[in-house]
Amino acid sequence: MGSTFIAYTLENIKASPAWTMPPYEQIICSCEAGTRSIAVGKLSRCDHIPSSNFIIQRGPVGTLIVVDSGTDICSYLLRADESGSEYHTTSLSSLPESLCVIPFTTCTVMGTDAYVYNNSGGVLTIMWMGSSIYMTITIYGRHDTFAKTVDNLHLVQNCSRQFYPTVVAEPRKDDPQQNSEAAQVLSKSVPGFIEYVGANPTDTLHEHTPPILDKFPHISGEDILIEALREADLRMEDSQCSPVNYPSPMPYGFTEDSCLLESVKIYP
């Protein structure tokens, strides 16, 4: 049973006051810089984030996090158990040293050229310290069976335009494909994912081609992880943030392999 850890560190935060209209909550923020780290087993990746805007929305069915760098956008939808009455035990807050812990049952990640769904649960934490915010998403392993995602995949085709949160600060334009890489890395790294990608990356989601589910056979999560890393030729780093972001194309097929580390090229 493997787990995946995603961590955002955002510095020099400018946040709007928390907006609350029960049962909905929202915080809109901007940051001058930050990092995003993804760890799967013994492998890890860390990228620098440019000046960006982000939005945190919370409702009765889940929590939505959107990170917008101006040239690209990535969103995380963490759905809650609808039968869990303890979901709203804590409220979103931007006060210093505030902490919010939110459990979830499924995770959906969407970028401009990727749609990834995982039917494993986990925990989201949001902590404010001084002028920085720390957000972590921990996904616990995978279920034995895949969730049905056909209806969800059709939602991607019906999206007519991208959504950008209210602008708080002017983002830099010099780092394209920054945030969509999060979805791409997750699709190759998290066991149990079903993914959908268009044949050609585009600026709008509605131009994706229809999903072809038979390209993704039902195999073990370890096999998916091994082959995805090999197909994508990921640049994996050991505990250091890479100064630039490398493109990470989505894999289009999976086969078996016996050695995980041999499938990953290590770059200095």
Curated annotation (Swiss-Prot):
Tagged with keyword Cell membrane: no
Source organism, top-level taxon: Viruses
Subcellular location, record wording: Host nucleus
Pfam families to which the protein is assigned, alphabetical: Herpes_UL4 (PF03277)
One cellular component term from this protein's GO annotations in UniProt: host cell nucleus
Keyword set includes Amino-acid biosynthesis: no
Keywords: Host nucleus
Protein family: Belongs to the alphaherpesvirinae HHV-1 UL4 family.
Name by which UniProt lists this protein: Nuclear protein UL4 homolog
Organism (species): Gallid herpesvirus 2 (strain Chicken/Md5/ATCC VR-987)
Species classification: Viruses, Duplodnaviria, Heunggongvirae, Peploviricota, Herviviricetes
